[in-house]
Amino acid sequence: MLRWIVWRDLMLAWRRRADMLSTVFFFVIVVSLFPLGIGPETQLLRTIAPGVVWVAALLASMLSLGRLFANDYQDGTLEQLLLTPQPLFLVVLGKILAHWIVAEVPLVLIAPLVGVQFDLSRETLWILFVSLLIGTPVLSLIGSVGAALTLGLRGGGVLISILVLPLYIPALIFGAGAVEASVMGTSPSAHLSLLGAFAIVSLLFSPWATAAALRISLE
């Protein structure tokens, strides 16, 4: 069931490639605006790079959260999935995994390329990649709860932002902190460990919370 959900959502996302590309373009544009606006101040660029890239990734991931369950809700597929004998949290976990692959993995892969604009070293670019690889699943996991709670509501995109942005703060602090530690020449292992722990906690609780929120929204 989990594999089928992931494959189905990936195929649907491939048919709507423009949505995926818009997320990537938004991320690239937001990150690229800062070097253009600040100019060739390499030390300043290296200082602000961790926060800029992580905030851009956070905002870009939110662009697609509203579509996480909306399409299946509108065509009735979500209600049919709710009636299947399979546990709902498996359906939710499959959709979260597909969302991460479609919306977050491209950002993780392209982040080191846009990070070059900030004059980051190879080691720091690697830490940037690793921090996003560990941290972006958190964005999809926590974001799914907000998407489920606001399902079918008018102005749901704004409500999702209000609900999930405060919960993203630990991931932002630990992820950007790991990159900043690398920029400063210190070990990022503590920040990466905390980010990994936060990701594990999110994985344990978010699918269940999202499944419960979907049941409430569909009643």
Predicted regions and their residues:
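Junction motif at the cytosolic side of a transmembrane helix
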Residues: 203-219
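Transmembrane helix boundary and interhelical loop/hinge segments in multi-pass membrane proteins
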Residues: 62-82, 96
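Hydrophobic alpha-helical transmembrane segments that constitute the membrane-spanning cores
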Residues: 93-118, 138, 142, 175-176
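Long, hydrophobic alpha-helical segments
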Residues: 49-65
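Aromatic- and glycine-rich beta-strand/loop motifs that create alpha-glucan
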Residues: 1-23
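Membrane-interfacial helix-loop-helix connectors in multipass membrane proteins
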Residues: 37-48, 112-133, 151, 178-194, ...
